[in-house]
Design a protein with these regions (language model features):
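Phosphate/pyrophosphate-binding loop motifs in nucleotide- or prenyl diphosphate-using proteins
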Residues: 7-196
């Protein structure tokens, strides 16, 4: 217990310093520090994955500036925190934060929303309302983030639940884009093979 308290105080002290000081010049030679104190190249698979997750989180932040229902805003806000946790896992090899329940929650949300949507007979193009287009943009960024995390997993084992989470998240974003269009009374844009 005492060791745990000491560690927490030390962690707060380190984080306070790291968050207060914006630049350190330590990365000027192409390396950067990870959460466990180790160094890695700025173009390493781990840093590429962190960047993709951060980009996804930023896109979801942009979505939150749109006029969305309180329920969807709450879902997206929780996702932002989970993505930050996922970034923490990537930054600290061997660290696990994302849990099975986080994955199950995404699955429940997907199932709940999807049952109220009309069945798809054609592929959907990104678009409709601006908020839905942003959601589709987040979905495509999520797919890329997923690729980077799975690539990292091929070399260094990543938390199984984190892999499941990032995979389910892109599915949720697809469903949410449709839900947002429905709420805004805007039709989804359907693919037309022979359009001229």
């Amino acid at each position: 217990m005492i060791v745990s308290l000491m560690y927490n105080r030390l962690e707060r002290k380190i984080m306070g310093y790291r968050l207060s000081k914006i630049f350190t010049r330590n990365g000027d030679k192409g390396t950067t520090g990870l959460g466990d104190g180790s160094k890695t190249k700025k173009f390493s698979d781990r840093i590429v994955a962190l960047g993709a997750i951060d980009e996804l989180n930023s896109m979801i932040g942009l979505m939150l500036t749109e006029n969305l229902t309180p329920k969807i805003k709450k879902i997206l806000t929780v996702i932002q925190h989970h993505l930050f946790n996922l970034g923490g896992e990537i930054s600290m090899p061997g660290h696990k934060i994302i849990q099975k329940n986080d994955v199950l929650e995404l699955e429940e949300i997907i199932t709940s929303y999807n049952k109220d949507l009309p069945p798809l007979k054609e592929f959907i193009l990104p678009g409709g309302s601006r908020a839905a287009a942003f959601c589709h943009m987040a979905r495509t960024i999520c797919r890329r983030a997923e690729q980077t995390v799975f690539k990292l997993n091929s070399k260094d084992t990543i938390n199984t639940f984190s892999l499941q989470y990032i995979n389910r998240l892109s599915d949720l974003l697809f469903v949410l884009a449709r839900v947002i269009n429905k709420h805004k009374k805007v039709k989804d844009v359907f693919w037309k093979k022979n359009i001229r």
